[in-house]
Swiss-Prot record:
This protein's encoding gene: whiA
HAMAP family: HTH_type_WhiA
Family from the record: Belongs to the WhiA family.
Family matches, as InterPro entries: Homing_endonucl (IPR027434), Sporu_reg_WhiA_N_dom (IPR018478), Sporulation_regulator_WhiA (IPR003802), Sporulation_regulator_WhiA_C (IPR023054), WhiA_LAGLIDADG_dom (IPR039518)
Entry's Gene Ontology molecular function annotations: DNA binding
Record keywords, A-Z: Cell cycle, Cell division, DNA-binding
This protein's record includes keyword GTP-binding: no
Keyword match Phosphoprotein: no
Gene Ontology biological process: cell division; regulation of sporulation
Protein name listed in UniProt: Probable cell division protein WhiA
Length: 328
């Protein structure tokens, strides 16, 4: 989770000056972290975040936009919490904050998705909504086979709204539900990199992209190595099998075999794991690999025909599983 902390630290340093963008980020942060309480007929907005920096950012933005200050409570780390949590509580002005950020509708009912001013807003507001959502409950995994950027959401409607905001900024995201928890997931590497850049985590994006390229290059090298190794094993098995068949062919034909075919066959028997090209260089005089292959094919064909005439096991009978013990 080191990358997640780096992303959040960088996002908390992003300077926002436009009020519409700031409002979108605040509304999103509250949507994905806040709970609404009714205390003495007054709505209290309570938001729980995982860092002092995020708590300070949210406090400053709300104060700048709405002139409302929260109570700040720190909950220490415990058995179920690795880090302290920061609870911001707006008791005075909670109703106004909930209405202005559309946590509730005009008649006071809770809204489950994102505010309409984000859904129908600008691309900058969609980016701000994603920044707020990531600061609220986002994390990113190290690049690899299962790399992902995820945001936990309080409802399916909130997840679908975030997917829609991602689509507006050309980022591919999907919803996912596991054990009753709704999430928005981005798995495409290019989309993850684009979103990090848009949100303002450029430095972390460069680190993530570098790790991604390293993993991809390593995986490609491993695939090539495995491919080459498999090819070598197949070639070695074929050469050993051919040598066993040639040896059986020479037994069947005995001395009744043309000298040039016998010479090629003897080379195959003496150099069991050599390639055809290597056998051609060892021949006297040297031959091409096609010439060696042709002579060995004719030798085996002659021997199989002779074995059929005499009722003997043919050259294929010499190829047994024990031959490949040393090769595999």
């Amino acid at each position: 989770m080191a990358l997640s902390a780096d992303v959040k630290a960088e996002l908390n340093r992003v300077l926002v000056t436009r009020h519409d963008v700031m409002t979108a980020e605040v509304a999103s942060l509250l949507r994905y972290t806040a709970a609404l309480h009714l205390v003495g007929k007054k709505i209290v907005v309570e938001s729980e975040v995982d860092s002092a920096e995020t708590a300070r950012r949210l406090t400053d933005m709300v104060e700048q936009l709405y002139k409302i200050e929260p109570e700040h409570q720190i909950i220490g780390a415990g058995n179920l919490r690795r880090r302290p949590r920061h609870v911001l509580r707006w008791t005075e002005g909670g109703m106004e904050l909930a209405r202005r950020t559309e946590l509730i509708d005009r008649v006071g009912r809770p809204v489950r998705g994102l505010p309409r001013f984000i859904i129908g807003g600008t691309k900058d507001q969609c980016v701000a909504a994603w920044r707020g959502a990531f600061l609220a409950h986002g994390y990113i995994t190290d690049p690899g086979r299962s790399s992902a950027l995820e945001v936990q959401t309080p409802s399916n409607e909130a997840a679908l709204a975030l997917v829609g905001a991602a689509r507006r900024i050309d980022v591919t995201a999907k919803t996912k539900e596991a054990r009753g928890v709704n999430r928005v997931v981005i798995r495409d590497g290019d989309s993850i990199g684009r979103l990090l850049m848009l949100m303002g985590a450029q430095d972390t994006r460069e680190v993530w992209e570098k790790q991604r390229r390293t993993r991809e290059n390593r995986a490609k090298a491993n695939r090539l190595a495995n491919f080459d190794d498999a090819n070598l094993r197949r070639s070695a098995r074929a050469a050993v099998a051919a040598a066993a068949r040639v040896e059986r062919a020479l037994e069947i034909l005995d001395n009744d075999v043309p000298q040039h075919l016998a010479h090629a066959g003897q080379l195959r028997v003496e150099h069991k794991e050599a390639s055809l090209e290597e056998l051609g260089r060892l021949a006297e005089p040297p031959m091409t690999k096609d010439a060696v292959a042709g002579r060995i094919r004719r030798l085996l064909s002659m021997a199989d025909k002779r074995a059929e005439e005499l009722g003997l096991p043919d050259t294929h009978s010499a190829v047994t599983s024990e031959l490949f013990n040393d090769v595999d």
